[in-house]
Amino acid sequence: MLNFCSLYSGSSGNSLFVESENAKILVDTGMSCKKIEEALNSIEVDPSSINAILVTHEHADHIKGLATISKKFDIPVFATKETFDAMPAQTEKLAEKNINFFNPNEKFYIEDLEVLPFSIP
């Protein structure tokens, strides 16, 4: 079973929490680390329990808190190489061990959660 919770949605910032039996992930981190922590705490999720952050694209309303939350809680980040290259202000602050690339249309796993990324033209 999957649980979803939209933490933030809109032009000011986007972040989605997804939970499976063994995985807890954030899809985008478009608000500050502090606001994302508060939102997670409000749904009784410990931010240090997050297994991964998936980045959909490099717009500020999707990555604002990326480097801070990844660094603070030592959370691996997953994105395409092109997305990483387009957000150097964020990625330069990430621990190298937490940088993970994926390719569109190639599934991968985060714990028991299968992820199948795709591109939208």
Predicted features along the sequence, with ranges:
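Short, flexible loop segments at the rims of nucleotide/cofactor-binding pockets, characterized by
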Residues: N3-S6, G30-S32, I53-T56, P117-I120
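A generic structural signal for short beta-strands and their flanking turns/coil linkers
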Residues: N14, A23, S49-N51, K71-F73, ...
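Short, solvent-exposed polar/charged micro-motifs at secondary-structure junctions
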Residues: S15-L16, H57-H59, F108-D112
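Divalent metal-coordination and catalytic microenvironments
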Residues: V18, D28, H57, V77, ...
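Active-site metal-binding motif and surrounding structural segment of the metallo-beta-lactamase
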Residues: K34-T83
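Metallo-beta-lactamase
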Residues: K81-P121
